[in-house]
Amino acid sequence: MACKAYRELAFENGIKTPEIVAPQSAHAAFDKAASYFGMKIIRVPLNKMMEVDVRAMRRAISRNTAMLVCSAPQFPHGVIDPIPEVAKLAVKYKIPLHVDACLGGFLIVFMEKAGYPLEQPFDFRVKGVTSISADTHKYGYAPKGSSVVLYSDKKYRRYQFFVATDWQGGIYASPTIAGSRPGGISAACWASLMYFGENGYVEATKQIIKTTRFLKSELENIKGIFVFGNPQLSVIALGSRDFDIYRLFNLMNAKGWNLNQLQFPPSLHFCITLVHTRKRVAIQFLKDIRESVTQIMKNPRAKTTGMGAIYGMAQATVDRNLVAELSSVFLDSLFSTDTVTQGSQMNGSPKPR
C-alpha cells in the first residue's frame, strides 16, 4: 500500500513513470507492487556485509524516483540496511523512504527493553523515514492475513485510498486493495496482541535474540561455512567457499530441519522463532550442522543431488523467463480442476499413441 501511495504522490508531482529504488535484497513484494501499479523497480547492489550500497543507491536516484526502500531486516540474510544513511538521501532529494520491517517489526521495537539495543535507529526518529510496514502474523503471532503499515504523516496515508464518486451503487471508498475485509482476522489479531502484551513480546524477543546470538557465534566457528553479514535479529544465512551449500540443505532436511534455500549467491538461512528457544533445540541444531559439514568436507567436490540440485539448476538457468514459466505452470496446477482418467495424462488430454 505504501508503493501505491507513493505512486499517487509521484503522479501528483508530475512523474509519469514512477520508480522504486530498492536494495537487491528487498522483498519480491516490491517487484509485485511495481507490476501491479505500473511502476519500475530499480534494484541496487549490496556491499560485502549484505547491506545496501548507499553510494549505488544515490546513483540510482533520478527525477522519476517515487520512493526509496530499506529493510529492517531483509529476508535473505537477516541484515538491517543502513537506514539513517539512506534517510539522508531521502531528505536531500525530497523522496519518501519506506522501511520494510514486515519480518522483524515485532522484534526490533522490543529489542532495547529486551536488553539488545540495535546498532542504529530504524523508525520515525530518523528524519526522512516516511512509512514502516510490519507483519502482525510473524513475530506478532497473529493469524495470517493481517499486517500493518504506518505513515509519519497522514498526508501520505491518504494517497493509498481509492474513492469512486460516480458509481450508480453510490460513493465507493476503500482504504486498501481488498474491498471487503473479514472482521474475524482483525479481531484475532487484536486478541493476539492483548494476550502477549508488551511484557510478553519483550520476553519473547529476549529469548529469540539470545538464541540467535548464541547460534551465530557458534556457526561462525565451524570450518567450511560462514555467516553472511552481521545479522542482528532472528535470521542467519550460511554460505560456503568449500562446497555446494545446497548439499548442506539436503543433509539437514534429512535430519528434520526446514531451512530456506537462497540464490545469488547460493546460501541457506534459518529463521529462529520461539519454538527454537526451547531447551536443547539450538544444541541439537548445532550438532546436526557440525555432523553434516564434517560429512560433506570428506568429499567437498561431490555433486549435489535431490532438491538441492534442482534449486541449484534453477539458479544457474540463464533464461529467467524459463524459470518464470515453470513457476507459473506450478501455480496453474494448484488451481487445476482436471482429473486423471484411464488413458489420459495429468492435464486430462489423451495420451499419445
Regions found by a protein language model. Name each.
Residues M1-K4, F30-Y36, V79-P82, L107-A114, ...:
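Short acidic, glycine/serine/threonine-rich loops at helix termini
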